[in-house]
Amino acid sequence: MRQRGRATLLVALLLLVQLRPESSQWSPAAAAANVVQDPNLRWNPGVRNQGGGVRALLLLLAERFPRRAGSEPAGERQRRDDPPLSIDLTFHLLRTLLELARTQSQRERAEQNRIIFDSVGK
């Protein structure tokens, strides 16, 4: 739980560093838009190292958690329709781990087959 709080704090600090008061992201009109309008600024998980990981993270967070014009108390928050980010990350990590496990098992099978063919060929 403590690491999760640190990660959240780090992300918040990165967002604050990227946003400037003269930027349009601080205006109520931009907050009311509620989406990132420029398609070039959309986060694409297939494209890596295009402008750095921090920029991609900030763009993803800007899409998922747009700024609201008024601050609402915690009990009156609007319910989000899209799934939480942690589920997306969990499934991404699961797919990656399954792919790594599949690759490793293929290597082990290839090594076992090589040993068998070497012993039969002698």
UniProtKB/Swiss-Prot annotation:
The protein's UniProt keywords, in alphabetical order, are: Amidation, Cleavage on pair of basic residues, Hearing, Hormone, Secreted, Signal
| Subunit (UniProt) | Interacts with CRHR1 and CRHR2 (via their N-terminal extracellular domain).
Instruction: Tell me which residues bear Valine amide.
Output: V120
Main location as per UniProt = secreted
Top-level taxon of the source organism: Eukaryota
Task: Name its cellular compartments.
Answer: Secreted
Give a single Pfam family match: CRF
KW Nucleotide-binding (keyword) present: no
* Family classification: Belongs to the sauvagine/corticotropin-releasing factor/urotensin I family.
Organism of origin is Rattus norvegicus (Rat)
PANTHER family to which the protein is assigned, alphabetical: CORTICOLIBERIN/UROCORTIN (PTHR15035), UROCORTIN (PTHR15035:SF11)
Prosegment location in residue numbers = 26-80
A cellular component term, taken from the record's GO annotations: dendrite
Signal peptide bounds = 1-25
Gene Ontology biological process terms, A to Z = aerobic respiration; associative learning; drinking behavior; feeding behavior; female pregnancy; learning or memory; negative regulation of apoptotic process; negative regulation of appetite
Q: Would you tell me the protein name for this molecule?
A: Urocortin
Q: Which InterPro entries match?
A: Corticotropin-releasing_fac_CS (IPR018446), CRF (IPR000187), Urocortin_CRF (IPR003620)
Question: Molecular function (GO) terms listed?
Answer: corticotropin-releasing hormone receptor 1 binding; corticotropin-releasing hormone receptor 2 binding; G protein-coupled receptor binding; histone deacetylase inhibitor activity; hormone activity
